[in-house]
Curated annotation (Swiss-Prot):
GO cellular component: cytosol
Family designation: Belongs to the anthranilate phosphoribosyltransferase family.
Needed cofactors: Mg(2+)
Record: residues binding anthranilate 2: 168
Name of the protein described by the UniProt record: Anthranilate phosphoribosyltransferase
Keyword Magnesium: yes
Highest taxon of the lineage: Bacteria
Gene: trpD
UniProt-listed NCBIfam families: trpD (TIGR01245)
Positions with a binding annotation for Mg(2+) 2: 226-227
Family matches, as PANTHER family: ANTHRANILATE PHOSPHORIBOSYLTRANSFERASE
Binding site for anthranilate 1: 82
Length: 337
């Protein structure tokens, strides 16, 4: 076993960790074996040094090895998630996109937690709607099979996350756990759209996904946002057959108008709930609908639907039908049986 002191000394010298060192470090983290002051120092050192794809992949393996097992789902399983920490406090686009994608016929396993750095995290929103976020894994699997949608609450699957919550809150900034969050979904989706909070993270995240053996993925950075943008260009690293292809898309590539970031501003969970409810009922603002649609359109590309404009139009029609709220309502009802 590698000593914690030797790992910390390397980080204080801004040296990269080996696979084994990073695995051991995050095993210590998730088992509550690192005291709070040292946790904050380690997370700060990692951030200043900049995390490598090897450090991220080994941390993912350590965290998944300490997570409750989720029953395997037959066929393709999608994930739409952002790292958070982009600082813009937009409405919950990835959560809404997951509900819309499920309505469109894609099985989506949404993994996440309550807010750390924004006003309203994905599971704050879901709780405000009345979703029981602590379903047993077999019940969540059945919900996925019935309604194409399952919510996996991170602290329920990995109780060790309680050991790191305080350090993350104290730091009030994004840390490696923002990067790890999208990668440690216990349902292990094979088709994922992951939004990152920095352009510098696109390639390390993509390389990490290749190292983890993910089938198809798109890592996106939307000019400041951790999702596909409607205010400016979006940088993409797409993964297929372990190959990474980088490109940039604009709102016009999706066939939509360009909007301002302020058009997507969120608020407290109650305010966000009302905004999201209107979108799901087919009564949302054009900017809100567009933001959700382009993210689902990018997911559809991972299913060999390459025409982003056509994908976006299909999704907008589904949104405007109001059927998406029915999907959420079915999940709410099922989760409270």
């Amino acid at each position: 076993m590698i000593s914690l002191k030797s790992i910390v000394d390397k980080l204080y010298n801004l040296e990269d960790l080996s696979y084994q060192e990073s695995y051991q470090l995050f095993d210590y983290f998730i088992k509550g074996q690192i005291e709070l002051p040292l946790q904050t120092s380690i997370l700060t050192a990692l951030k200043l040094k900049k995390e490598t794809s090897i450090e991220i992949a080994s941390a993912v393996e350590a965290l998944l090895d300490n997570t409750k097992e989720f029953p395997k789902i037959k066929g393709d399983l999608a994930g739409i998630v952002g790292t958070g920490g982009d600082g813009f406090n937009t409405i919950n686009i990835s959560t809404t996109a997951a509900i819309v994608a499920a309505t469109a016929g894609y099985k989506v396993a949404k993994h996440g937690g309550r807010s750390v750095s924004s006003k309203s995290g994905s599971f704050d929103l879901l709780e405000s709607f009345g979703v029981n976020i602590e379903l047993a894994p077999d019940q969540t699997k059945q919900c996925l099979e019935l309604y194409n949608l399952g919510f996996l609450f991170a602290p329920f699957y990995s109780e060790g996350f309680r050991y790191i919550r305080e350090a993350r809150a104290i730091l009030k900034t994004r840390t490696i756990f923002n990067i790890l969050g999208p990668l440690i979904n216990p349902a292990r989706p094979n088709k994922v759209v992951i939004g990152v909070y920095s352009k510098d993270l696109i390639l390390p995240m993509a390389k990490t996904l290749v190292n983890l053996g993910i089938d198809r993925a798109a890592v996106v950075y939307g000019s400041g946002l951790d999702e596909v943008a409607i205010h400016d260009g979006t940088y993409v690293a797409e993964i297929q057959n372990s190959q990474i292809t980088e490109y940039k898309v604009s709102p016009a590539d999706f066939g939509i108008d360009t909007y301002a970031i302020k058009d997507l501003e969120g608020g407290l969970p109650e305010q966000n709930r009302e905004i999201i409810k209107q979108i799901l009922l087919g009564k949302g603002k054009e900017a809100h609908n567009a933001a959700v649609a382009v993210n689902v359109a990018m997911l559809m590309k991972l299913y060999d639907k390459d025409d982003l404009k056509q994908n976006t139009q299909e999704v907008l029609e589904i949104i405007k039908s109001g059927k998406c709220f029915n999907t959420l309502q079915q999940v709410i009802n099922y989760s409270n049986k």
